[in-house]
Design a protein with these regions (language model features):
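Condensing-enzyme catalytic core mediating Claisen C-C bond formation in acyl metabolism
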Residues: 1-47, 147-205, 209, 213, ...
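Buried hydrophobic positions in well-ordered alpha/beta secondary-structure cores of metabolic enzymes
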Residues: 9-11, 60, 71-74, 92, ...
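A structural motif shared across PLP-dependent enzymes of the aminotransferase-like
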Residues: 18-29, 51, 80-91
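Claisen-condensing/thiolase-fold acyl-transfer catalytic domains that form or cleave C-C bonds
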Residues: 50, 54, 80-81, 99-101, ...
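Phosphate/pyrophosphate-binding loops at sites that engage ATP/ADP/AMP, CoA/4′-phosphopantetheine
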Residues: 56-72, 212-230, 249, 284
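Membrane helical hairpin/interfacial module
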Residues: 68-94, 99-102
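Short beta-strand segments
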Residues: 77, 133-139, 162, 174, ...
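Flexible, glycine-rich active-site loops centered on histidine and acidic residues
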Residues: 126-159
Length: 344
């Protein structure tokens, strides 16, 4: 899908809690041998997907420096909202001063909800319905203690302030391509606390099939090849999968490394690929092309192609500071902060 009207990123932001638990600490408790990430982010006792989304969206708004009343949409993608019935988007919109005249909605498509939010906001702008819009991906990822996901399920948020005022944009969205199938690789039924997954089924039939399908689809439709991109950001459930996907598609490791942050913060689910994009935008130079490919279980992938403008680099997010600001906790404190310890 090529946007018929130019849509740009005026501002962007990210939030990562400063608590960390090391993979070796999780292995110590559960006698695991594999550590898919070095460490992962852990939310504070007063943090959840809603509060993290507020922080990321506030940073994007401040970078964009737009009037709050001109932001016409706020789409929040997450699979871990704090309320089963009550939208996060209205709370965030109120906290940011966007209410009452704003389209605000919660969205869910596992780990690709954030990129889908961005595509829909871009569509509203390109269609002339709104001037500016916010797309947010945020998650406090859940995992059963001792499960494979317990090693990687992190916490974080990222936000994009999209606009038709492209002369001030740091990057322009050129193309978007979505690829979905009914693939039951990961799910959580109503009333269940933790998600379930078919571990071996999450690789080839799910992650790689959809990532490759979306990336190839966009490149074929737009006439691009891997060498046309300076950076590529894949959804990152662990460190290995994005590197393998890059190899399968013909990308080089140096195109992937900058946006690969899961080794430091774990899998932040709906925020994962967007946090990777934030890091790339913080370091990119004008005229560089970026490919972002998300993945959400169930299953599907969004591929988004962007090109940076001369404005990139003039302002940067707080991501590098957040990545370096760490307080390590042991497994007991981690379990307490994640709400894994229940008192009868």
């Amino acid at each position: 899908m090529k946007l018929t009207t130019s849509v740009g990123i005026l501002g962007y932001g990210a939030y990562v809690p400063f608590y960390r638990v090391k993979g070796s600490e999780i292995s110590r408790i559960w006698s695991g041998e594999d550590e898919p990430v070095r460490e992962k982010s852990v939310p504070g006792l007063d943090e959840d997907s809603l509060t993290m989304a507020c922080e990321a969206a506030r940073e994007a708004l401040e970078m964009a420096n737009v009037k709050r009343e001109e932001v016409g949409a706020l789409l929040v993608g997450s699979e871990s909202p704090p309320y089963a019935v009550k939208p996060s988007a209205t709370v965030i919109a109120e906290a940011l001063g966007l209410t009452p005249r704003v389209v605000a909605i919660d969205m869910e498509f596992a780990c690709k909800a954030g990129t889908t939010a961005a595509i829909l906001v871009a569509g509203l702008i390109a269609g002339g319905a709104i001037k500016h819009g916010l797309a947010v991906g945020t998650d406090n990822a859940q995992a059963r203690p001792g499960d494979e996901l317990d090693y990687t399920a992190g916490a974080g948020a990222a936000a994009l302030l999209l606009s038709r005022e492209v002369e001030s944009a740091v990057a322009l969205i050129e193309y978007a391509y979505s690829y979905v199938t009914d693939t039951p690789d990961f799910w959580r039924r109503e009333g269940e606390r933790f998600p379930r997954h078919t571990f071996r089924f999450t690789g080839a039939p799910a992650y790689f099939h959809h990532i490759v399908g979306a990336a190839k689809g966009l490149m074929e439709e737009a006439g691009f090849k891997p060498s046309d991109f300076d950076y590529v950001v894949f959804h990152q459930p662990n460190v290995r999968f994005p590197l393998r996907a890059a190899q399968m598609l013909g990308f080089k490791e140096e195109q992937v490394k900058l946006g690969l942050v899961c080794g430091e913060i774990g899998n932040t689910y709906a925020a994962a690929s967007l946090i990777g994009l934030v890091r790339v935008l913080d370091h990119a130079r004008p005229g560089q092309r970026i490919l972002v490919v998300s993945f959400g279980s169930g299953a599907g992938s969004d591929a988004i192609c962007l090109v940076t403008t001369e404005n990139v680099g003039r302002k940067k997010s707080s991501l590098e500071r957040l990545l370096s600001k760490k307080v390590y906790v042991d497994y007991a404190q981690y379990a307490k902060q994640k709400g894994l310890l229940k008192v009868a």
